[in-house]
Structure formats: structure tokens, C-alpha cells
């Protein structure tokens, strides 16, 4: 293979993994469809009432549609990207999201996350770590997550105006506990 073609192939494959299948969402419900998307992309999900992280696509629980509700998402080292974020729209019980070393997460993803009505109501904890494409703009977009109680930010070199960004965010979300580990 010529140099760069492997990267192009993986980029194409990741885009395929992130393509939203609206018929699938209708057929199996938002939580099952989102679980399939997240696991396909290398993320983990935890369902309500379960202490265990689900990581095996083939091990997804079966049962009545709507029985398993996603409560937490750990997207460490996953290939989730903006293109797949429509899967998040129908999720009503997600309280905790961790985005760590997600090379495709960028400001538009955080903006999309914060504009998702159900997440505005349910999301309480968000951790963003080592996502090199995130800038101040993406962090400022999080102000719409009005129920967010805890935000952890670490190793985000794209954040340049730290003091201003965090002051604006704290004013918008006065109950937010903000933990920073930034250079």
C-alpha cells in the first residue's frame, strides 16, 4: 500500500462506522441503536442498574426493546465523530460521558452534544481528556448543558484563553464543579 493509504482507509472505515442508520433507531429503539454505534466505534456503555461496562458488541443484552437504557458512555480511544451524534438524540438517561483520546472529537461535537435536548436534561458529569481538536469554542458551547454538575478537563492544548473561557462557563453554570488539569 502506498504511504497514507492506510490512514485514508481507516478514515473511511471510521466514517462508515459513524453513519447513522435512522431505520435501525426506529426498529430497535434509541438506546440499543446508540449502544451498537458506540461499541462499533470502540466505546463502552453502561446501562441503568448495572455496574458493568459493556464492551462486546456481540454481548449486548437482548430482551424487550426499551429495557436497557444507557446511563454512561466511556469513549476512550474510540472513533466516534460528529457524523454519528444523531444517535445521541433519543437517549434520555445518560448521566456520565467520558471523552478521552478521541481524535475525531472537535468543537462541533461538543456543540452538538450541548444542543441535544435530552442530554441537557440528563447529563451530570462530563470528562474531556487529551482531545487535541477541542478549543475554547467547544468548551464554551457546553454552557447549554444546564444540569451539568461536574466537568473535568485535562490535556487540551487547543484551549488558549483558559481564564476567560472558564469564567464565562462558571457564570453560565454557577452550580458546576470545574476540575482542571491543563498546562
Predicted regions and their residues:
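LRR N-terminal entry segment and analogous cap-like coil->beta motifs
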Residues: 10-26, 33-124
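Short, aromatic/basic amphipathic alpha-helical patches
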Residues: 163-171
Amino acid at each position: 500500500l502506498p504511504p497514507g493509504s492506510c490512514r485514508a482507509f481507516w478514515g473511511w472505515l471510521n466514517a462508515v462506522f459513524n453513519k447513522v442508520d435512522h431505520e435501525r433507531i426506529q426498529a430497535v429503539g434509541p438506546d440499543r441503536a446508540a449502544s451498537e454505534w458506540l461499541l462499533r466505534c470502540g466505546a463502552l456503555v453502561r446501562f441503568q442498574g448495572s455496574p458493568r461496562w459493556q464492551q462486546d458488541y456481540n454481548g449486548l443484552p437482548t430482551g424487550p426493546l426499551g429495557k436497557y437504557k444507557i446511563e454512561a458512555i466511556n469513549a476512550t480511544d474510540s472513533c466516534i465523530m460528529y457524523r454519528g451524534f444523531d444517535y445521541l438524540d433519543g437517549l434520555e438517561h445518560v448521566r456520565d460521558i467520558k471523552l478521552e483520546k478521541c481524535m475525531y472529537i472537535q468543537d462541533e461535537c461538543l456543540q452538538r452534544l450541548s444542543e441535544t435536548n435530552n442530554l441537557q436534561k440528563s447529563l451530570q458529569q462530563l470528562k474531556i481528556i487529551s482531545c487535541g481538536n477541542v478549543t475554547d469554542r467547544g468548551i464554551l458551547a457546553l454552557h447549554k448543558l444546564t444540569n451539568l454538575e461536574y466537568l473535568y478537563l485535562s490535556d487540551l492544548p487547543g484551549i488558549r484563553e483558559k481564564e476567560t473561557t472558564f469564567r464565562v462557563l462558571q457564570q453560565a453554570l454557577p452550580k458546576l464543579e470545574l476540575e482542571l488539569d491543563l498546562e
